[in-house]
Swiss-Prot record:
Gene Ontology CC, one term: cytosol
Listed PANTHER family: GLYCEROL KINASE (PTHR10196:SF69), SUGAR KINASE (PTHR10196)
Lineage: Bacteria, Pseudomonadati, Pseudomonadota, Gammaproteobacteria, Enterobacterales
Disulfide topology: none
Species, as recorded: Escherichia coli O8 (strain IAI1)
UniProt-recorded name of the protein: Glycerol kinase
Length: 502
């Protein structure tokens, strides 16, 4: 028997599908990535082709093994992490989708959400699903497809159609339709799942008229769900044994498995999650209550805050404003000036996320005087990412009563030392940047490996979580509070911009 030396993580993201091979020391052996098409049928609508998601993801699995010259019988297990909330409906018999995947960013169900609000469901939804009413989550997307594809609701009732988030779709394809499952973290993003009873919520299914027959079975984030024999030489059957939504996988990959530990992922947007242990903390400050993974993949809870514009605002400097040629240049120009010269940039291009949830806010630059140049605006744009992170952290500390000792960070923008130092300055808290930046894939790999005994427990992994650099606050409290007060003033003035005067 060949020694099982590796774990594969499949990381199905919003713009690309990736596969990562790791060894027992959590070193990355090889990576394969394929992008796929973003479909925008109307303004504010976003779709993916589920068959293309599957094609790109399955080919990266074959590629990543070939690249490292590894045969499939050396793989101990496969873990899956995925873009959350994105919704797919398909035929049980043929495996064919009945509609494109409706992506988490898609706003087409805003009207359904308005109806839910008018029907007075906000409190029920917040208390039972942990979420706010927003087109972001899967529930209204499922309803939209059932409303718009003729005969689909009846077919679903007869058990002919299946619903899944991306993890469910991939596993169904990888097991040739034998396994229809999701995990607690992904289920907690559907607005159809009761995070206290850990079961699908009958009232939500009734309100949205979604037949229970089409829903996947919900399982722990770390257990064997089924086997696949796709990819690589040898065609051995490999257990699929870990699933978590991307942000929860990153939280686990950063080993934030104890109450009060938090991470912030700086991608297109920012996602901050704080583990709250075995208690679901109901937010009074505009955050989401969601399910995370405990030390063995069991159910823990987390508070989550989403900032819509982080890396995206640096892309705006590059693509629309033409102030920089490359995202990496932003650090160089930001450090050419001592401060922002009184300027604040509020990047509310698509409204504001947590903790404001104002879809009518718009982007603005405040505090312009004659001495302001391009470098000040670049610096202020970077600083806005750190200010928004503080907004979310303040809400988290208020909700949980926990004072954060250190923030673990990951994602593309953490390579920017200026941003990380300013983040520490404005939070008044240590910021820890890990050696391995692929924490989302790491989380999926850890969950899969723990389930099959590849790793015995998380203690084995603690020593692998090397912090590459720690940033410590370098400004006084009065200065910190003065700057943050300016930010709050700027945000207030950017809010409700789009609301039309009667």
């Amino acid at each position: 028997m060949t020694e099982k030396k590796y774990i594969v993580a499949l990381d199905q993201g919003t713009t690309s599908s990736r596969a990562v091979v790791m060894d027992h020391d959590a070193n990355i052996i090889s990576v394969s990535q394929r992008e796929f098409e973003q479909i925008y049928p109307k303004p504010g609508w976003v779709e993916h082709d589920p068959m293309e998601i599957w094609a790109t993801q399955s080919s990266t699995l074959v590629e990543v093994l070939a690249k490292a010259d590894i045969s499939s019988d050396q793989i101990a297990a496969i873990g899956i992490t995925n873009q959350r909330e994105t919704t797919i409906l398909w035929e049980k018999e043929t495996g064919k989708p009945i509609y494109n995947a409706i992506v988490w960013q898609c706003r087409r169900t805003a009207e359904i959400c308005e109806h839910l609000k008018r029907d007075g469901l906000e409190d029920y939804i917040r208390s039972n699903t942990g979420l706010v009413i927003d087109p972001y989550f899967s529930g209204t997307k499922v309803k939209w497809i059932l409303d718009h594809v003729e005969g689909s609701r009846e077919r679903a009732r007869r058990g002919e159609l299946l619903f899944g988030t991306v993890d469910t779709w991939l596993i169904w394809k990888m097991t040739q339709g034998r396994v229809h499952v999701t995990d607690y973290t992904n289920a907690s993003r559907t607005m159809l799942f009761n995070i206290h009873t850990l079961d699908w919520d009958d009232k939500m299914l009734e309100v949205l008229d979604i037949p229970r027959e089409m829903l996947p079975e919900v399982r722990r984030s770390s257990e064997v769900y089924g086997q696949t024999n796709i990819g690589g030489k040898g065609g051995t059957r490999i257990p699929i044994s870990g699933i978590a939504g991307d942000q929860q996988a990153a939280l686990f990959g950063q080993l934030c498995v104890k109450e009060g530990m938090a991470k912030n992922t700086y991608g297109t947007g920012c996602f901050m999650l704080m583990n709250t242990g075995e208690k679901a903390v109901k937010s009074e400050n505009g955050l989401l209550t969601t399910i995370a993974c405990g030390p063995t993949g069991e159910v823990n809870y987390a508070l989550e805050g989403a900032v819509f514009m982080a890396g995206a605002s640096i892309q705006w400097l590059r693509d629309e404003m033409k102030l920089i040629n490359d995202a990496y240049d932003s650090e160089y120009f930001a450090t050419k000036v001592q401060n922002t010269n009184g300027v604040y940039v509020v990047p509310a291009f698509t409204g504001l996320g947590a903790p404001y949830w104002d879809p009518y806010a718009r982007g603005a630059i405040f505090g312009l005087t004659r001495g302001v140049n391009a470098n000040h605006i670049i610096r202020a744009t970077l600083e806005s990412i750190a200010y928004q992170t503080r907004d979310v952290l303040e809400a988290m500390q208020a909700d949980s009563g926990i004072r954060l000792h250190a923030l673990r960070v990951d994602g593309g923008a953490v390579a920017n030392n200026f941003l990380m130092q300013f983040q520490s300055d404005i939070l008044g808290t240590r910021v820890e940047r890990p050696e391995v930046r692929e924490v989302t894939a790491l989380g999926a790999a850890y969950l899969a490996g723990l389930a099959v005994g590849f790793w015995q427990n998380l203690d084995e992994l603690q020593e692998k979580a090397v912090i590459e650099r720690e940033f410590r606050p370098g400004i006084e409290t009065t200065e910190r509070n003065y700057r943050y007060a300016g930010w709050k003033k700027a945000v207030k003035r950017a809010m409700a911009w789009e609301e039309h005067d009667e």
